[in-house]
């Protein structure tokens, strides 16, 4: 399972870890990512989404149905 949000397509970034001496080493900035179950009223079923905290805020803001339609329209999520 890749750590990519199914709603916002947010994924980890690469950058530098900078010491006080300005010595830089490559590191990875991970996303605040988790799996969560939602009850989809329109289809009358439970769905499991791999989402970031930003994706959860989007669902809370515009609703699950609108977020799923928006993500599937952009090609982030495939609905059967």
Swiss-Prot record:
One of its GO terms (molecular function) is structural constituent of ribosome. Residues 1-21 are annotated as: Disordered. The gene is rpmB. NCBIfam families: L28 (TIGR00009). The keyword Ligase does not apply. GO terms for cellular component: ribonucleoprotein complex; ribosome. SUPFAM superfamilies: L28p-like. Keywords: Ribonucleoprotein, Ribosomal protein. One of its GO terms (biological process) is translation. Belongs to the bacterial ribosomal protein bL28 family. Signal peptide: none annotated. This is Large ribosomal subunit protein bL28. It holds the Pfam family Ribosomal_L28.
């Amino acid at each position: 399972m890749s750590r990519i949000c199914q709603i916002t397509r947010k994924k980890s970034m690469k950058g530098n870890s900078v010491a006080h001496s300005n010595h830089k080493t490559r590191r990875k900035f991970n996303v605040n990512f988790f799996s969560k179950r939602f009850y989809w009223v329109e289809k009358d079923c439970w769905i499991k989404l791999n989402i970031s905290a930003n994706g959860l805020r989007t669902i809370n803001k515009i609703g699950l149905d609108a977020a799923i339609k928006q993500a599937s329209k952009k090609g982030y999520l495939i609905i059967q």
